């Protein structure tokens, strides 16, 4: 009689050593340049390091990113969008396409963050043409900030809705239809308060919390999938149905293609949070490598785990007619109860999903508060000194005022739900619009420079893939923005209309007005460590190593010049344009006199002496 084994011997021996991060790193070797490439150079900026540089590791960035892009929480709370606009095909294929395209977007954004390891408005400032630096940086920063605030609100509010659904599972009459939104907002306020207090009082545990997040999501997926398959009472759907069935009758759209495009909203709400991670650059030891790799690994892990999570749900999916009978609870709750015919088991499954809420909520407040801090350092926000304040004797080095501001914004947006659910949903849709457009600006600027500006980035896409991945990313961002603006069902009423575009336009107008009222006179461009003249595309940098503060440089003309330079660079290098190397660098001319700050003129030697006190238009 043959001997049967559950797993092949080689799999059993090696499965305990399986590391998903290692698998994703191997995948990155296909699209990324070799890490050992020469001439790696990340831009460093002359800001005082106030936050804890060792607070987060690359693994913690992956965990925080997975929390922001949790397929368990995100796909479950927005399941109605996919079910109405096509069902399994829209959900599964839409998530796969979104996962690949958003991974491309994370790779493209990772190049910029690797070269300019700060929040995205910094990268836009460094990439933009001279006359547009201030404007590009301003719009990128504000769109990213608004996107952070609204995405944080959408995550916590979705969790509050799921909590109410959990309460109503046993008795749907506990809360009346008239008071449903009121109690949802109360739960929302509680969630925001809890995750905010964790950021204020227990920030030193965020590293551990982010790592636990990965394990929670993975085990939640395993438990939910297995329990659904084991305790399913009806007939299983075929694999063909689970992957390719399409029915958009509930949407009212005659066009199947349009319904499919609208279905991307579900995946975009889930996966767009990757662009919030660069705000954490001040709290990572090696941000030029850890942020890009952590960001793309988080997208891959979220997409991969999301597919595994969704397939069993599609296999036990009840008919749509049974899923929208009770509008007080989310469709995912009806899926569990109709499939298992057990309130107790369904209650446990929803609890596993709600566990993600804690990690996602904490991470969203963390990133939004750091976006406030980073943008305020350049005086972009009124009362910027308050938002950048960090208690010098605090153990965790957290910008507490920025955390409180992010909580207040969430509280305010939550009030909109009491006034109008359509208005609140519009702000949630605007979250994706703002994040997409804030990512769009620096990506377009990279193509505008023909990718020369990121040539020496420590993490860089291989040349043969770079243009393709950048262009696909830009097209995807535009498609995502169009998708989010469309109503999920037609015909529309005043209550069901999608007002996301109107809110987005309103945000643009406010940002523009604030620019002319405040930004034009107070906002300052990011301050780099050293002064660099513009480098033409056909020129290469000449790099001189400074052994100490007094060095003799022999110029091309044979002239020896002694320079006394205060070296602020960590690497100890100063870059000199080869075209200018034959000239006396301390002689005033059109190239070395900075005239952007009034009528006062300084030579290059004086500018080095003032490097710690002034900001430069890079």
UniProtKB/Swiss-Prot annotation:
Annotated Gene Ontology cellular component terms: endoplasmic reticulum; Golgi apparatus; Golgi membrane
Cytoplasmic domain ranges by topology: 1-60, 111-131, 172-179, 232-297, 368-402, 450-464, 517-618
Any matching Pfam family: AA_permease
Keywords associated with the record: Golgi apparatus, Membrane, Phosphoprotein, Transmembrane, Transmembrane helix, Transport
Topology, Extracellular side: 85-90, 149-154, 201-211, 318-342, 420-425, 487-498
Positions of transmembrane segments: 61-84, 91-110, 132-148, 155-171, 180-200, 212-231, 298-317, 343-367, 403-419, 426-449, 465-486, 499-516
Biased segments, Basic and acidic residues type: 598-618
Gene3D superfamilies: Amino acid/polyamine transporter I
SS bonds (residue pairs): none
Residue positions, PTM Phosphoserine: 569
GO molecular-function terms, A-Z: gamma-aminobutyric acid transmembrane transporter activity; polyamine transmembrane transporter activity
Membrane topology note: Multi-pass membrane protein
Origin superkingdom: Eukaryota
Annotated localization: Golgi apparatus membrane
UniProt region (Disordered), positions on chain: 576-618
GO biological process, one term: polyamine transport
Job of this protein: Required for polyamine transport. Transports putrescine effectively and spermidine less effectively.
PANTHER family registered for this protein in UniProt: AMINO-ACID PERMEASE BAT1 (PTHR45649), POLYAMINE TRANSPORTER TPO5 (PTHR45649:SF3)
Family, per entry: Belongs to the amino acid-polyamine-organocation (APC) superfamily.
Name assigned to this protein: Polyamine transporter TPO5
Species assigned in the record: Saccharomyces cerevisiae (strain ATCC 204508 / S288c)
């Amino acid at each position: 009689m043959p001997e049967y084994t559950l797993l092949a011997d080689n799999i059993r021996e090696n499965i305990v050593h399986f590391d998903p991060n290692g698998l994703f790193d191997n995948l990155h070797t296909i699209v990324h340049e070799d890490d050992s490439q020469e001439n790696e150079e990340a831009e460093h900026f002359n800001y005082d390091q106030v936050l804890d540089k060792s607070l987060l590791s690359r693994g913690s960035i992956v965990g925080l990113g997975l929390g922001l892009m949790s397929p368990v929480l995100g796909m479950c709370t927005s399941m109605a969008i996919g079910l109405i606009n096509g069902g399994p095909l829209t959900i599964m294929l839409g998530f796969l396409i979104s996962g690949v395209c958003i991974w491309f977007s994370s790779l493209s954004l990772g190049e910029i963050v690797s070269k300019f390891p700060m929040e995205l408005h910094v990268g836009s400032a460094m990439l933009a043409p001279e006359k547009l630096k201030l404007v590009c940086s301003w719009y990128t920063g504000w769109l990213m900030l608004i996107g952070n605030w609204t995405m944080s609100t959408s995550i916590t509010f979705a969790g509050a809705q799921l909590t109410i659904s959990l309460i109503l599972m046993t008795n749907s009459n506990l809360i009346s239809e008239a008071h449903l939104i009121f109690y949802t907002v109360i739960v929302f306020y509680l969630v925001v308060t809890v995750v905010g207090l964790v950021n204020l009082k227990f920030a030193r545990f965020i590293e551990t919390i982010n790592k636990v997040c990965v394990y929670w999501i993975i085990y939640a997926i395993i438990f939910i999938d297995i329990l659904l398959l084991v305790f399913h009472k009806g007939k299983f759907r075929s694999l063909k149905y689970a992957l390719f069935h399409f029915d958009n009758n509930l949407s009212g759209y005659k066009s199947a293609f349009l319904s499919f495009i609208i279905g991307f909203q579900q995946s975009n709400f889930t996966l767009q949070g990757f662009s919030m991670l660069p705000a954490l650059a001040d709290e990572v030891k090696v941000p030029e490598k850890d942020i890009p790799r952590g960001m793309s690994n988080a997208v891959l892990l979220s997409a991969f785990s999301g597919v595994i999570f969704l397939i069993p749900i599609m296999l036990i999916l009840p008919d749509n007619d049974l899923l929208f009978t009770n509008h007080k609870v989310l469709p995912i709750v009806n899926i569990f109860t109709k499939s298992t015919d057990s309130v107790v088991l369904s209650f446990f499954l929803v609890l596993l999903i709600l566990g993600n809420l804690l990690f996602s909520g904490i991470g969203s407040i963390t990133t939004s508060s750091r976006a406030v801090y980073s943008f305020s350092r350049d005086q972009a926000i009124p009362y910027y000194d308050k938002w950048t304040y960090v208690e010098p004797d605090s153990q965790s080095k957290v910008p507490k005022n920025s955390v409180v501001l992010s909580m207040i914004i969430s509280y305010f947006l939550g009030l909109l739900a009491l006034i109008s659910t359509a208005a609140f949903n519009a702000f949630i849709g605007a979250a994706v619009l703002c994040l997409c457009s804030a990512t769009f600006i620096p990506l377009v600027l990279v193509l505008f420079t023909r990718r020369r500006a990121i040539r020496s980035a420590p993490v860089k896409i291989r040349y043969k893939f770079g243009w393709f991945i950048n262009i696909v990313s830009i097209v995807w961002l535009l498609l995502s923005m169009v998708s989010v603006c469309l109503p999920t069902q037609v015909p529309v009423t005043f209550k069901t209309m999608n007002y996301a575009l109107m809110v987005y336009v309103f945000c643009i107008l406010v940002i523009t007005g604030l620019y002319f009222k405040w930004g034009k006179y107070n906002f300052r461009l990011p301050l780099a460590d050293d002064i660099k003249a513009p480098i033409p595309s056909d020129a290469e940098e000449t790099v001189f190593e400074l052994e100490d503060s007094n060095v003799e440089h022999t110029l091309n003309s044979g002239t020896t010049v002694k320079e006394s330079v205060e070296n602020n660079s960590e690497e100890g290098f100063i870059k000199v344009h080869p075209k200018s190397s034959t000239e006396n660098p301390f002689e005033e001319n059109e190239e070395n006199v900075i005239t952007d700050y009034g009528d006062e003129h300084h030579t290059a030697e004086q500018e080095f002496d003032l490097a710690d006190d002034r900001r430069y238009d890079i």
